[in-house]
């Protein structure tokens, strides 16, 4: 069996390791357009759950990587000098460059052929390959040549973001929000190795335009951002690495394969960085694809069917959560107006995957602060009462709680106007 992987990112490399390890007589080759030590971006994030999966799949790479991780259990939400810490968020960060180098090392140990500075434009040279894995990233050339077959859809979102680094040490994942005369900016930040942290700055397109940023002027970007986040950077500078302002593309594909080509990683599906699942998604899909190839070998249709069966629902669930989170940040000028604890709670629950009950288990002190702020503002003497069960006043009417049941379908009004059915129904009860 011969398998060719186009793209030497975490997903492509991890797939190659797992397949070659399980099927040593399989020929596995990886072609990467960049140099072996090139890496764009700074750090990557994994959850405790994902790390556990890596341990069971390839202990060797897990042992190599885990010594390089920066771990944290806390998440901070900061807004214009106010800050609250929420515990119970098990994550770790790692340098993307270090991760790639360690995965490359494991590939060589297992006998995977690695080819760097190999820009693949024509797949005909791999006509003898049983499977071609298109792991060539968010701007996948292979996907672009087969958009109709894959059913590719790309939606460019409106917010602007730029990926930078800093020497500023951080002991938690932190969201720094800053209000400016132009609008709201947020920095998604975390430490990924000793003395280095990732800083992803995001704002709405309108705010970005008002502030006078340029897409590719890195020097100007650093100057302006450093001034906005002067207090948060605490004397530390920002570091660029081809750090251009971008807009996030939400990529979906109706099919993940065509002929003997199969999509992996960002070429297949993107998840907004605000939920930290991009690299996780790629590597978990690499596991499923490797399992499918190991099970069905050269029966490519069975391989691809099983791959989608294992991952389609999970990928779409993560994408949905990421898109909901993305939408929250597109509306952050509205959210920023809330009282601080309510705002922090909104940040934590923005993807709808985390609920009040989840947070109460992770950090009961935080949810107590949220309720206390809410009840104090509402004039309730019991500061532990759930918001849903507090009275609510609408003009001259006060109801006992805030729970609303949706009406039955027959109560629907046409264009917001009552019909003869409503007149008869309510008239009979007058």
Set out the residue ranges of the language-model regions:
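C-terminal helical "tail/cap" subdomain of flavin- and related membrane-associated enzymes
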Residues: 6, 67, 291-381
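Conserved N-terminal helical subregion
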Residues: 48-165, 364-377
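Conserved FAD/dinucleotide-binding core of flavoprotein oxidoreductases
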Residues: 82-89, 95, 110, 171-250
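Conserved N-terminal glycine-rich FAD pyrophosphate-binding loop of Rossmann-like flavoproteins
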Residues: 35-53
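Conserved Rossmann-like nucleotide-cofactor binding loop
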Residues: 11, 15, 36, 139
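Glycine-rich FAD pyrophosphate-binding loop
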Residues: 20-40
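Conserved mid-domain beta->alpha element of the FAD-binding
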Residues: 4-21, 133-134, 164, 244-324, ...
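Flavin-dependent oxidoreductase catalytic cores
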Residues: 368-430
């Amino acid at each position: 069996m011969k398998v060719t992987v186009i793209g030497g990112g975490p997903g492509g490399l991890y797939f190659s390791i797992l397949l070659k390890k399980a099927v040593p007589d399989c020929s596995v080759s990886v072609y990467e357009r960049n140099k072996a030590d090139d890496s764009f971006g700074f750090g990557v994030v994994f959850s405790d759950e994902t790390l556990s999966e890596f341990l069971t799949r390839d202990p060797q790479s897990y042992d190599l990587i885990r010594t390089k991780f920066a771990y944290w259990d806390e998440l901070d939400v900061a807004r214009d000098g106010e800050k609250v810490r929420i515990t119970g968020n098990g994550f770790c960060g790692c340098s993307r460059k270090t991760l790639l180098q360690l995965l490359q090392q494991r590939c060589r140990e297992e006998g995977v052929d690695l080819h760097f500075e190999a820009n693949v434009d024509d797949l005909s040279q791999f006509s003898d390959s049983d499977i071609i894995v298109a792991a060539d990233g968010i701007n996948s050339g292979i996907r672009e040549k087969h958009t109709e077959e894959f059913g590719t859809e790309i939606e460019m979102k409106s917010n602007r973001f730029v990926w930078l680094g800093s020497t500023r040490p951080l002991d938690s994942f932190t969201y720094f929000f800053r209000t400016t005369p132009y609008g709201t900016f947020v920095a998604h930040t975390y430490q990924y190795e000793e003395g280095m942290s990732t800083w992803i700055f995001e704002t709405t397109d309108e705010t970005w335009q008002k502030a006078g940023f340029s897409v590719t002027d890195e020097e100007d970007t650093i100057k302006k951002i450093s001034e906005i986040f002067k207090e948060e950077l605490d004397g530390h500078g920002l570091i660029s690495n081809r750090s251009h302002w971008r807009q996030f593309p939400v990529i979906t594909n109706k099919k993940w394969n065509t002929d003997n080509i199969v999509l992996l990683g960002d070429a297949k599906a993107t998840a907004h960085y605000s939920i930290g699942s991009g690299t996780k998604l790629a590597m978990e899909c690499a596991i499923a694809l490797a399992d499918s190839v190991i099970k069905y070998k050269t029966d490519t249709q069975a391989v691809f069917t099983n791959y989608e069966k294992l991952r389609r629902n999970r990928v779409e669930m993560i994408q949905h959560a990421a898109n909901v989170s993305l939408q929250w940040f597109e509306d952050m000028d509205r959210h920023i107006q809330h009282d601080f604890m309510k705002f922090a709670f909104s940040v934590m629950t923005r993807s709808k995957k985390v609920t009040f009950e989840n947070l109460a288990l992770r950090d009961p002190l935080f949810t107590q602060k949220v309720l206390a702020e809410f009840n104090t503002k509402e004039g309730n003497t019991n500061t532990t009462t759930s918001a849903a069960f507090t009275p609510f006043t609408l003009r001259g009417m006060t109801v006992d709680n805030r729970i609303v049941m949706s009406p039955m379908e027959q109560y629907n009004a046409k264009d917001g106007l009552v019909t003869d059915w409503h007149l008869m129904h309510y008239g009979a009860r007058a």
